[in-house]
Structure formats: C-alpha cells, structure tokens
Amino acid sequence: MHKQKTIFMFSGQGSQYYQMGQPLYAHNAVFRYWMDHLDAFCRRSWGASILELIYDPTRTRANVFERTPLSGPAIFMVEYALAKALEDAGVRADLTLGASLGTFAAAAVAGAVTPEDALTSIMRYSRVLEQHCPRGGMLAVVADCALFEAPELCSRTELAAINFASHFVVAGLEAELADVERWLGQRGIAHQRVPVSYAFHSRWIDAAREPLLRCFDELPLQPLRIPLICCAQSRTFHTWPDRAFFWNVIRDPIAFSRTIAGLVHEAPYRYLDVGPSGTLATFLRYLLPADSGALVQRVLSPFGGELQNFEAVVGAVRLGVPERV
C-alpha cells in the first residue's frame, strides 16, 4: 500500500489577522523559534518588528489587518514557522502549493529560497507597489462565477481568483469596488472585502512590472527539493521556472479551482492547510468529490482550536490514521 502524499498549502494576502498563531507562539518552541528568528531579521533589515504588529495587545482577531507592506511578511512568517513546527513533529510535505503571496512560503519550504531572502523580496515588492501603483483592493463574491460577466462587475473590475464554482474574487480601484459593493448589496449577493491595499492579480499593478521583475531577479534561488504547485499557472514544477515566475504569481489570476481539479486526477492527497485562516481547506470542501479519498486538514483558524488541531494532525501522521480536522 502506497503512503498517502502530503501537500502543504500556503495562502496569500487576505488570510491574515491579528493574533494569528498566538497559541502556538506561546506553547510550541519550534514555532516560537522561527517567529523570533525571522522577526529579528526584520528588525535588523528594516527596523520594524512584525511580531509586535501581529501580537499587538491592543488588537484582537476581529480587527482588520490591512497594512499590505507589513501583512505580507507577517503571513510569510506564520506560514513558514508553522511548516517548520510540523516538520519537527514528523509531519513533512511531499509537495508544496502556493496561492498568490503564499507561493513565497511554498518555495521556501520546498528549499528553493531561504526564508530571509523570501522575506526581503516580499518587503521590497510591497514597497514597489506603494511607489508605482494606485490604491485599490479586492472583493470576494459568493455567487456563481458567471456573475462576473455582468457589466456592473466586468466593466469596473478584473477577475482575480476562482476558488470554487460559487466563490470568486475581483480586483479594482477603490471607487469602483465601492460601486460594485453597493450593486451586490442591493441584490442580496454575499460579498466581503479582502483586507489588502492594492488590486493584486489585475492590470492595476502593471505599472510595477519592470521594477518588480528586477526585484525578483535579485532573489537567490536553489533547486527545488520537492515539487511546487503554482495556482497562478495550475502547474506542478519539479525544476525552477524562469525569473518572471514570482511576477506571474502576483499578477495572474489565482486558479485554485482548476489547480485542484488537476490534482484530484493524480492521487488522493492529504491536503494540509498551513495558512493562518484555513481558507484553502474550506475551499477544498467544495471542490473535492466525495469519493476522492483525499484528506483535508488545517491547523490555524481565527476561531481558535489551534493547539488541538496541531496535535490531531501530528497524532494522525504518527499513527498512520487518517484524521480530519
């Protein structure tokens, strides 16, 4: 009987919240080590503490965490630290999957880039966006993806992601998004702002293309230790692609639904969400056929239970017993 392969899934902008990973930071030595280590690097490099931001005692999980220049490094730190804590406990990835910004953590865990270099690249690209791009945002819509063809949406925004049949994301400038929100609200269509400051995965970041390509070209890369699945291209990479890879990751639409459809035909994987919110695990519940044989697990959640989830995932792997979280 073949061992079920594990995919570590890393989500991107929008999955962040204050106090994310706090129970693990308090109780898991490996998670805390990597958070402290990476925060010390941020302090030395930019004079800013990401830890002080994430675990600001005046902020709760309910507060909106929208500061893009710092939310990117914060997401990366939490995802990388959680992956290392899982590895130390015996839970290892056979493949990594990255959605948008999460691809940086996926690449680091796959051995292609050091966490310090990945953090540097994330901070640089956040500053490039500030210098070259207009303020904008993203809006998640809970409706059939065909709704995007409505003139009120497609004339004002661009399709940024398709997560499953009845969940998609649009990107646009602030004024246009406000109009779209009003239009959706008038029709009783569920929607939610993604806590970002720019219209990722759309033409409104194209002004940053050349400086970002130069930024990513300076990122030292090593051969992939394990395969990396890219949701921007719905492809599994066994060798490192061209230098435009990370630009495509933040510019092209996130094709999560199509990516998973391809994986379902390969094998019944164990999908382990290593993101702060468990968002990708939630999407999978709408994508995987009932008879797929796949397992879906998460550790972190804005609703709590992180320590129990961590122990359940580790215990299931040690015992070889499938356990859903």
Residue spans for each PLM region:
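FabD-like malonyl-/acyl-CoA
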Residues: 2-150, 190-196, 271-283, 295-306, ...
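Cysteine-centered functional microenvironments
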Residues: 61-71, 95, 155-171, 196-200, ...
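Hydrophobic side chains in well-ordered alpha-helices
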Residues: 121, 148, 179-180, 259
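Short, flexible, solvent-exposed loop/turn segments with mixed acidic/basic and small polar residues
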Residues: 126-132, 155-162, 236, 262
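Phosphate/diphosphate-binding loops
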Residues: 143-145, 157-159, 166-167, 212-215
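Helix N-cap motif at beta-to-alpha junctions
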Residues: 145, 172-178
